[in-house]
């Protein structure tokens, strides 16, 4: 079951462990990094931190919304064995108080939902040796 967790109720160790178990662990979703770039961030948590999704919200003119914080290229669902269905379930679990969202999901979170715009993202895979990386360039 996916639940909304306020910042002060998030277990930082379990959160970070879920991020690190992801097929694409990213510093952008680590609790210490979020504390620096988006103080007061909240999150969605599946079961006992099996999967997690950071939520960075604000309020303007009485309207709550989600946004991508500065210095965070991607957010999305982090955990072990993330599927398209899990991503959709997380998106459905975003509290209704957020009337608008402009967030960048993980590059592996490819979903087809009306109103969701897919954008091109270019990443450099650093888990290869330097010669392999160089061979991809002219």
Model region roles, listed by residue range:
Residues 1-6, 10, 111-138:
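Acyltransferase donor/substrate-recognition loop-hinge adjacent to the catalytic core
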Residues 1-28:
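Short amphipathic alpha-helix that is part of the acyltransferase structural core
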Residues 10, 17, 31-86:
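Conserved donor-binding loop and adjoining core beta-sheet/short helix segment
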Residues 21-22, 40, 97:
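Structured helix-beta-strand junction loops
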Residues 25-34, 102-106:
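A short, aromatic/hydrophobic, helix- or strand-capping loop or linear motif
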Residues 54, 76, 102, 121-123:
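Generic structural signal for residues positioned in beta-strands
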Residues 57, 81, 107, 124-128:
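Non-catalytic surface loops within mature trypsin-like serine protease
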Residues 84-121:
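Non-catalytic accessory segments adjacent to catalytic cores
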């Amino acid at each position: 079951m996916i639940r909304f967790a306020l910042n002060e109720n998030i277990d930082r160790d379990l959160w970070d462990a879920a991020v690190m178990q992801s097929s694409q662990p990213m510093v952008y979703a680590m609790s210490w990094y979020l504390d620096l770039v988006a103080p007061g961030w909240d999150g969605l948590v599946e079961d006992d931190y099996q999967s997690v999704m950071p939520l960075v919200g604000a309020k303007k003119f009485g309207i709550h919304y989600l946004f991508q914080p500065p210095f965070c290229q991607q957010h999305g669902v982090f955990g072990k064995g993330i599927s398209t269905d899990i991503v959709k379930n997380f998106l459905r679990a975003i509290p209704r108080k957020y009337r608008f969202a402009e967030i960048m999901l993980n590059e592996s979170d490819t979903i087809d939902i009306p109103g969701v715009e897919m954008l091109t993202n270019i990443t450099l895979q650093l888990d290869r040796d330097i010669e392999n990386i160089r061979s991809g360039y002219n």
